[in-house]
């Protein structure tokens, strides 16, 4: 292990692929699309997308707890733009369908009845043909600027949603509910308790990221307090909060913002976008190949299909901010999926998931039915289920309609399905947390480590099995009551008791490995303006008259520093004795896009990092770091700061 002689020498250690690419995890993520200016209507939506300035993000979150909703995100699409955005192929198809439906006299005798199977086959073929043709179609442009593709209206027949058989109409007597429904009074929206209001006065660069995450969760669940939520609902039962405020979540996403994303970014079917439907008791994914351009996506939507955006936080900076702040509180990856369902439709069959789900209703309405896990083994499930038939479900524990502004939480293993109403579409976000965060996951990491160490230490575990083992043990020999069988069983149990009890150090090591996994999965932090000037992101370099590089920052032993976030790094001692700092500062916006980022330090330098971890959220002077010399203290602090892990109390400028 090489000892760094200068701060610049303390470079990240990684695989050879990472070292070859100087821009790995940095330049690619920080590059922003060059968006053309359009009408005021488009600009108002662009402000909500990933190109939004950090100042607007900061302003948005500073208002979260004073105002129950953000500003209006878009204006109504003008009729002229709507007409211009429709393709000629779609006009011809819609006109042909209208003619076929209305011409009852001239063609009635010529038409023959088709079987349901034939109709379904033709419908599928028609969808595929249209989507394959439109996936290469560029958005219509006016004066060189692409227009937003409006929602194509299609008259859906009234009646049951497009799934068969459907759950019966809501019957309060049929609901086996122990779920508490919280209704927020309009006069109370946006109010928070006193300790939260006091926290708001803390300067951004002095705030505790874990507490900030709790406040965002409180905003989502209001008026349910977080302490009450974790006591009464978390991993136990569903919690439904109904509000009379459709604007509560509107600043996070809208239908028009989704359309802008499809136009301005390259999204592919299957990778970024799923098209799903649930008809005749069968769940189908209808993803074509290629890019998900608006005409293809809205064509599927008009045919009653649900649209799922798999990584909306990549493109929506406000949603990404919610996820990055919440991951500090939950100490795990916080995912987000976006679901857009047309009126009178259902996109997914009944199933359960392996995540704690927060359903945030942004637009429209959707009826949700939740059921108890079919088996006890499914409670707090670790793997998502397959699809259930309606006949396999018992009485719902909740049967309620979510309106815009409402939020529904339910734990892992809760079977659920959702259907839109006849005249209402639905746009909701599902935040997912605590996937693979159970004690079982810890033990799966811990026990192989314990066994390996025990085998190395104990010759008893390395001794060979008795020759007669296969003749006395096994399912076929359960009825054998011989003494040798009992002796072998006792020997195995004693070995487990004597050698496989994990020590405190073993548990620490296993938790470090799980935390290292979180560093690989986490979204990179969003550095706010007041933080940027205190971090490497605000540093600038220039050249003097001789061409030497001159940096605009310099540390001394009186400089005060702290970690950028509470969970920005993980100090891990690997099995070979090396000490590494794993972090997620340079992670990509796509899930595990790069190999894990880490920097290797000397074992004696670990104490300085441990002190920074324990001191958070407070600042320490560099002179307080427990290292032998001032030069070494400054060197270590500078290296951590240059990697984006530290923040100074005062800007250098």
Curated annotation (Swiss-Prot):
Modified residues (Phosphothreonine): 137
A Gene Ontology term for the protein's cellular component: nucleolus
Record Pfam families: JmjC_2, RIOX1_C_WH
Family matches, as InterPro entries: JmjC_dom, NO66-like, RIOX1/NO66-like_C_WH
Family affiliation: Belongs to the ROX family. NO66 subfamily.
Start-end of Basic and acidic residues biased regions: 194-208
Domain JmjC span(s) in chain numbering: 300-450
Enzymatic reactions: N(6),N(6)-dimethyl-L-lysyl(36)-[histone H3] + 2 2-oxoglutarate + 2 O2 = L-lysyl(36)-[histone H3] + 2 formaldehyde + 2 succinate + 2 CO2
Cofactor, free-text remark: Binds 1 Fe(2+) ion per subunit.
Subcellular localization(s) per the UniProt record: Nucleus
Compositionally biased spans, kind Polar residues: 13-26
Protein name per its UniProtKB record: Bifunctional lysine-specific demethylase and histidyl-hydroxylase NO66
Origin species: Drosophila melanogaster
Chain positions found as Phosphoserine: 44, 131, 138
Cofactor(s) for this UniProt protein: Fe(2+)
Disordered: region residues: 1-50, 65-137, 184-208
Role summary: Oxygenase that can act as both a histone lysine demethylase and a ribosomal histidine hydroxylase. Specifically demethylates 'Lys-4' (H3K4me) and 'Lys-36' (H3K36me) of histone H3, thereby playing a central role in histone code.
């Amino acid at each position: 292990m090489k000892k760094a002689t200068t701060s610049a020498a303390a470079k990240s250690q990684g695989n050879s692929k990472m070292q070859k690419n100087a821009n790995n995890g940095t330049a690619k993520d920080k590059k922003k699309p060059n968006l053309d200016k359009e009408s005021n209507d488009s600009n108002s939506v662009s402000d909500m997308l990933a190109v939004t300035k950090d100042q607007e993000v900061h302003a948005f979150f500073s208002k979260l707890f004073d105002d129950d909703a953000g500003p209006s995100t878009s204006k109504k699409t003008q009729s002229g733009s709507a007409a211009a955005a429709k393709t000629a192929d779609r006009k011809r198809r819609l006109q042909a369908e209208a003619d076929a439906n209305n011409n009852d006299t001239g063609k009635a005798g010529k038409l023959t009845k088709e079987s349901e199977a034939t109709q379904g086959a033709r419908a599928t073929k028609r969808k595929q043909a249209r989507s394959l043709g439109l996936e290469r179609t560029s958005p219509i442009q006016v004066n060189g600027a692409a227009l937003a593709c409006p929602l194509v209206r299609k008259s859906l027949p009234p009646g049951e949603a497009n799934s068969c058989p459907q759950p019966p109409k809501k019957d309060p007597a049929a609901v086996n509910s122990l779920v508490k429904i919280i209704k927020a009074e309009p006069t109370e929206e946006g109010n928070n308790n006193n300790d939260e209001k006091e926290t708001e006065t803390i300067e951004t660069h002095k705030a505790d990221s874990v507490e900030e995450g709790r406040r965002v969760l409180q905003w989502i669940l209001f008026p349910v307090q977080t302490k009450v939520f974790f006591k009464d609902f978390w991993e136990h039962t569903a919690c439904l909060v109904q509000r009379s405020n459709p604007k509560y979540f509107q600043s996070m996403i809208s239908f028009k913002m989704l359309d802008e994303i499809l136009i301005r970014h390259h999204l592919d079917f299957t990778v970024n976008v799923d098209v799903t439907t649930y008809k005749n008791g069968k769940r189908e994914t209808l993803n074509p190949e290629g890019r998900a351009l608006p005409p293809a996506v809205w064509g599927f939507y008009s045919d009653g299909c649900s649209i799922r955006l798999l990584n909306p936080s990549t493109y929506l900076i406000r949603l990404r901010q919610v996820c990055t702040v919440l991951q500090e509180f939950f100490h795990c990856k916080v995912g987000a999926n976006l679901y857009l369902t047309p009126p009178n439709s259902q996109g997914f069959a009944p199933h359960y998931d392996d995540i704690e789900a927060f359903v945030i209703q942004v637009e429209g309405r959707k009826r949700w039915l939740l059921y108890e896990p079919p088996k006890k083994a499914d409670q707090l499930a670790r793997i998502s289920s397959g699809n259930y038939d309606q006949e396999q479900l018992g009485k719902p524990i909740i049967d309620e309609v979510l309106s815009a502004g409402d939020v529904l939480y339910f734990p892992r293993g809760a079977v659920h399905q959702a259907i839109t109403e006849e005249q209402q579409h639905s746009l909701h976000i599902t935040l997912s947390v605590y996937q693979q965060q159970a004690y079982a996951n810890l033990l799966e990491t811990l026990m192989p480590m314990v066994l390996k160490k025990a085998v190395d230490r104990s010759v008893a575990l390395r001794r060979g099995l008795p020759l007669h083992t296969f003749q006395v043990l096994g399912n076929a020999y359960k009825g054998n009551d011989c003494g040798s069988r009992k002796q072998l069983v006792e020997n195995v149990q004693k070995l487990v008791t004597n050698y496989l009890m994990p020590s405190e150090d073993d548990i620490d090591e296993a938790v470090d490995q799980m935390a290292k996994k979180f560093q690989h999965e986490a979204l990179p932090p969003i550095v706010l303006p007041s933080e940027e000037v205190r971090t490497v992101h605000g540093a600038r370099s220039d050249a003097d008259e001789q061409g030497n590089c001159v940096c605009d920052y310099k540390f001394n032993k009186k400089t005060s520093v702290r970690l950028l976030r509470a969970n920005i790094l993980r100090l891990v001692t690997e099995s070979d004795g090396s000490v590494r700092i794993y972090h997620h500062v340079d992670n990509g916006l796509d899930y595990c896009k790069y190999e894990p980022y880490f920097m290797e330090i000397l074992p004696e330098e670990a104490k300085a990092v441990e002190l920074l971890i324990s001191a958070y959220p407070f600042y320490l002077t560099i002179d307080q770091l427990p290292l032998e010399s001032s030069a070494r203290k400054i060197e270590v602090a500078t290296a951590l700061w240059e990697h984006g892990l530290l923040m100074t109390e005062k800007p250098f400028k």
